[in-house]
Amino acid sequence: MAAYTSKIFALFALIALSASATTAITTMQYFPPTLAMGTMDPCRQYMMQTLGMGSSTAMFMSQPMALLQQQCCMQLQGMMPQCHCGTSCQMMQSMQQVICAGLGQQQMMKMAMQMPYMCNMAPVNFQLSSCGCC
C-alpha cells in the first residue's frame, strides 16, 4: 500500500513539474524574460481556486482569493493591449493541460471572458476558439 501511495505521489509531482515547465516555456513567448518568470501564477491560481480545484492543489495555494485577484488584475493591466488575446489563449491552454480532466471547457471559457470585467478593463474582442484551445 505504501509503495502504491508513493507512486501516486510521484506521478502527481511529475505532472505538476511538467505543467509548470510548459507554462514557463510558453509564457516566455508573450512576455520579456524579466516578466516571464511566474507572471501568470496569480491568475492561474485564481482561476484554479475559483473553478473549485481539489484539496490536493489547495495546499500549494496559500494566498487568499482577494489577493490573487488583485495580483492577477495588476498583471493583466500592466500588459500591452495586443497581448491580452494571446495571454488569454495561453491561460486557457495552460488550464486545459493542468486541470481540464474534471471541468467543462465552458466554465474555463466563461472565466477567461470575465477577466477583463473583473479587473475593470475594457473588454478585448477576440475568439478564444481561434486559439485552438477551446
Curated annotation (Swiss-Prot):
Which is a Pfam family this sequence falls into? Tryp_alpha_amyl
Q: Which GO terms describe its molecular function?
A: nutrient reservoir activity
* Primary localisation category: other
Q: Signal peptide location in the record? A: 1-24
Where does this one sit in the cell?
A: Vacuole, Aleurone grain
Query: Matching InterPro entries, A to Z?
Result: Bifun_inhib/LTP/seed_sf, Bifunc_inhib/LTP/seed_store
Q: Which UniProt keywords apply?
A: Seed storage protein, Signal, Storage protein, Vacuole
> GO CC: one term?
aleurone grain
Query: Matching Gene3D superfamilies, A to Z?
Result: Plant lipid-transfer and hydrophobic proteins (1.10.110.10)
The annotated region (Octapeptide unique to cereal prolamins) lies at: 69-76
The family annotation for this protein states: Belongs to the prolamin family.
Cited function? Seed storage protein; serves as a source of nitrogen, carbon and sulfur for the young developing seedling.
Q: What is this protein called?
A: 10 kDa prolamin
Species of origin reads Oryza sativa subsp. indica (Rice)
